[in-house]
Amino acid sequence: MDSYEKEESVASTSGIQDLQTLSELVGPENAGEGELTIAEEPEENPRRPRRYTKREVKCVSYHAYKEIEDKHPQHIKLQDWIPTPEEMSKSLCKRLILCGLYSAEKASEILRMPFTVSWEQSDTDPDCFIVSYTCIFCDAVIHDPMPIRWDPEVGIWVKYKPLRGIVGSAVFIMHKHQRNCSLVKPSTSCSEGPKPRPRHDPVLRCDMFEKHHKPRQKRPRRRSIDNESCASSSDTMANEPGSLCTNPLWNPGPLLSGLLEESSNLPNLEVHMSGGPFWEEVYGDSILGPPSGSGEHSVL
């Protein structure tokens, strides 16, 4: 055997000689010398209350959902609660929630983005739910600033307060995250995913805005450049019978008399140009001046 082959064989067996036996690594029970046992997982931190979520249970039907709701009535609303599971699925409930928060165009825009939508019961108000959007690439969480609640009378999801323009929208933040996403999943050594940015409770935030927000004063209307009064109900000329044109050159009567001279149809044409006999009788407005009738049916 050559020296090269001797060195290669020694190098290939040196690692095996340094290894411990199987019984020393996993114990005599799991090494085949006794019964096979599975190591128990360490218990969770007793100080931290365990939150019951829908991820731990697979609800395959309405009866399974009702069974879970009966066993855990205080925890069923914590996450992804469906108000009427016999009528709607989770996918339909998600779409109804987005349509309650935003317009249909914005809701479809959110559904196209790479985010999973979930909703969780608020600790401040049990009737409200906080909607969160989780990135499918990096597991980043974005909370919607507007809470939502279920209205059982009409059977729809409605916003907590009519303050969408004040509290803001999550669509812009989601677009910004989508452009700057690192596309890297968090480390598997961490038991939990990345925590969202700490912020105020959306329910308390909306209450604070509603309490301290003052509506902006309306801007004054821009006046006309010539500052001349327009014909309106406050104008004295508008209440006077007769033609509104004060220039005799543009009065339809003299124009017609100049064009047609002495025509038998001149009064009829003038009456029809001013609005007809009904207009003249009721409103007293004619190009011929004040109404010629008795005025019993005249308004002005």
UniProtKB/Swiss-Prot annotation:
Chain ranges for the short sequence motif Nuclear localization signal as given in the UniProt record: 214-223
Keyword Transit peptide: no
Biased amino acid composition, Basic residues: 211-222
Pfam family, one: Foamy_BEL
Sorted UniProt keywords: Activator, DNA-binding, Host nucleus, Transcription, Transcription regulation
Function description: Transcriptional transactivator that activates the viral internal promoter (IP), thereby enhancing its own expression. This transactivation is repressed by nuclear factor I. Also transactivates the long terminal repeat (LTR) promoter, thereby inducing structural gene expression, initiating the late phase of infection. It is therefore a key regulator of viral gene expression. It directly binds to and activates DNA target sites of viral promoters and those of distinct cellular genes. Required for viral replication.
Name listed for the protein in its UniProt record: Protein Bel-1
Gene: bel1
